[in-house]
Amino acid sequence: MVHGKAQKAQKDLRIVMCFVCLSVAIVLLAGCARVSLQEPPPAAQISAPGVDAAEPVTAAAPDGSFYVAWVSHDAKQADVMLAHFNDKGERQGAPVRVNRQAGAATAWRGDQPSLAVATDGSVYVGWTARFEAAGAHGTDIYLSASNDRGQSFASEVKVNDDKAPGDHGMHSLAVAKDGRIYVGWLDERNVQHPKPSDKAEGHHMESNRDLFLAYSTDGGRTFSANQKLASEVCPCCKTSLLVAPDGTLYAGWRQVLPGSFRHIAVASSKDGGTNFSSPVIVSDDRWMLQGCPVSGPSLALDPSSGSLRVLWYAAGDAGATGLYLSESKDNARSFSPRQLISEEVVHGTPALAAGTHNAIAVWQSAGAGETKMRDLGKEGSAASSVAANAELPAGVIANDHLYVAYIAKEKEQRSIWLVRASH
């Protein structure tokens, strides 16, 4: 009897031990699975090998996918390229050339293409083309439209309506829920350039520009008469456009104030871009600069409150040099005191990526050319590294993940890379 009880006890112990081992194995496997899911895939080159590629820009689509556009350079010729990615970051087909005539585009580090996706899935790309004729030269703004998810593009349409040659650039693009397309840019048609004799010896400085706007109500086939929104605008700082769900249009730019103070300004329109509110200076940064910082504002809506957020770089006397954030809850009539996001020198225009649940700032840190990010929805979050050797980043949130496109350099060769950043 005692021997039988001992055998039964040993059997029960073996069962318990097997159960414990199985439970531990399940926990370990689950832990490994969680680690695997949390670890983002490595960065991947998305531009063609051996091609000099730069100026990336991103845009989210309503179905959770996203697009990346960039510019491939070959001496004085350039092409705007577009690639489509699903909500897992997997590329859908080969990149497509946006401009119909090969080599017709132009771009530089401060003025990348503009990109937007409509609620019906139509893809719109804004870009600039250089022209030279009879001793005159300049750049024009064009819009290209695709109705098949970026697989092909119709013939581009010129947006600026002036006839005399001149520079048009630092453009931005936004599409409303009703399909109305807005394009903003800096324009020199009314600018009186100083004569060579009026310039200080050995000193070159761009004249300030006017901010212009045009809109299309027919899918980008035609555009309205060009409308001037502001004068004395910093000539080499990117503009920004944003349309809220209620149709309110916001425009942001860097205004040059008396004394050469260069501060961020925002105006809004409630009637489809016909009339705008008086521009409001977001923050008195006390940044006096005899030159252009090549850094404009980024606009986004707060995912929870719907308020307008502005992200920009400043190096003025009002505080630390760095990246700042401000918020408006009254349609850009007033702004909250600025919040320091990162105290450091920043290159280029920072990106403000907004998703359904969060907003993330992305920027290039000067010096080593490192791309950084900070989740603005997490209390007490700090800046973290996205990638080294990563310049002029563009960020987009898809499927609650942040994807960052950036320029990598190897010797003098540039290429476009895409990485899913953990957050």
Predicted feature locations:
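Intrinsic disorder/low-complexity segments
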Residues: 1-36
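Extracellular, repeat-based ectodomains that mediate carbohydrate processing or recognition
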Residues: 33-423
